[in-house]
Amino acid sequence: MKADATRRLLSMDLDDDDERAEWEEWGNRAALERSAPSLSIPELFAEQVVRDPGAVAVSCGGRSVSYRGLDEASNRLAHLLISHGVGPGQRVALLLSRSVEAVVAIMGVLKTGAAYVPIDPSVPDARLRFVLCDAGPVVVVTTAELADRLAGHGLTVVDIDGRAVYSQPSAALSVMPHPDDVAYLIYTSGTTGTPKGVAIPHHNVTRLLE
């Protein structure tokens, strides 16, 4: 500072090497800078199923499900969704509360190669209508209790707890999505107040898990 009295404080690096390393660890900068792995979310999940199938994958509301159980349940849903024409490049809306079933639905959609569009059941009807019209899902996965909110939208509705899901095979699908495929479409409020959909690819998620 004495050497250059005109130098601005904002241009000076006041952290030592140890402090900089600590800041980078807190910000997970390494995850953002390293190249994305060549795996999709279902591929990373499949590796974990093989590695520790009996471990608890999800716990919510007093319920727990193992990686094997989550894998088989999501496979059943994926097979049913495919029978309804769901596949890569398409979107499936999820009108579900936070629950074990919601995680099953997410994995089931991802295994088809489609992207999921999460919708909080607490949103007003106007917001629900906007997201459904804007996202253009081919199927909506929900529960019997929430199905009435989808009346009049002309969409195929799948009950996550329905007999049609449980009658499907639990065998794995033969094709996995590409890491560059869109994993999900999340809607933000937008600067104008109009919800805006942001597409997130698989590799944006998996690089944080490596």
Q: Language model features by range: what are they?
A:
Residues 1-17, 29-206:
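Carrier-protein-dependent adenylate-forming modules in NRPS/ANL systems
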Residues 17-24:
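Intrinsically disordered, charged and Pro/Gly-enriched terminal/linker segments
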